Amino acid sequence: MAGLHATLHQALRGGYLRLTGIGGADLAPAHDSTHPCTMYSRCLRTLILLILLYLLGACVSTRVRVAEHVAGSRSLGAGSSVVLIEPDVELYSLMPSGLTELRADWTEQARTHLDRELRQRLAARGAGVLTLSELSEAEDRAARRQIELLYQALANSILNAELAPELLPTKRDRFDWTLGPGVSALRAPDQARYALFVLVRDSYASAGRKALMVLGPLLGVGASGGTQIGVASLVDLRNGKVIWFNLLVAQRGDLREAETARVAIDSLLQGLPL
């Protein structure tokens, strides 16, 4: 237990150099900012830390944060248009070694289910749902991609502030985050008011991993199964402020199936002020 505690704090302060997906990581300080996987690694670093937190006994299911000016609001801008950013989803197979393999077929299944459920939930709340592909072709695609990458980095910072507030003391007692005014590029042509960003990572134990989970204790080896982690944020496109944020951590739920994907979205959208 103490060893895991030390690993958690070392990882928070030093960062990861390489990630192998959910369940596998090389805990070494990240120095090469030019490495092609560096930005990806930084954005997913905290997701790996959440697994460590779970192992430390943190019973986390969802963690909702709302900006002060909307706290307590049950319906914020009802009927407003929301740009649904394509869900950033990756599903992995967890090997006996603890390494993971990205599964494109599983990922596509999950993305389809999650996208459909998100659209239905937003529509049920009276929101007009837009996607980037439906926006004007005159929009700068490269600029929009930069906004998506900026959000990934911001989400990572929010998670760090929530899980280790001593690292960002100015954010300890207030939820005040922004993507900046550049995010307004997502508003045209219909002047959408909000954007919803969703990031999900999930892993599933392979047959070999399941066997190790059963036989491992007899050999003095501990092995865990997969972990589902999701992050969702609602951003005000008029000023770039993050007005709602939710973190989901679960040990169960197969996103490859429509019904369990529906349950995951219900949890992920908990407290959404729309």
Predicted feature residues:
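Residue-identity detector for glycine
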Residues: 3, 14-15, 21-24
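Basic polycationic patches enriched in arginine
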Residues: 13, 18, 42-45
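Repetitive helical segments and hydrophobic/amphipathic motifs
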Residues: 18-19, 54
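Sec-dependent bacterial lipoprotein signal peptides
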Residues: 34-59
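C-terminal/domain-edge helix-coil "capping" segments
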Residues: 60-94, 113-114, 174-194, 199-274
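N-terminal segment of the mature soluble domain
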Residues: 97-201, 244-247
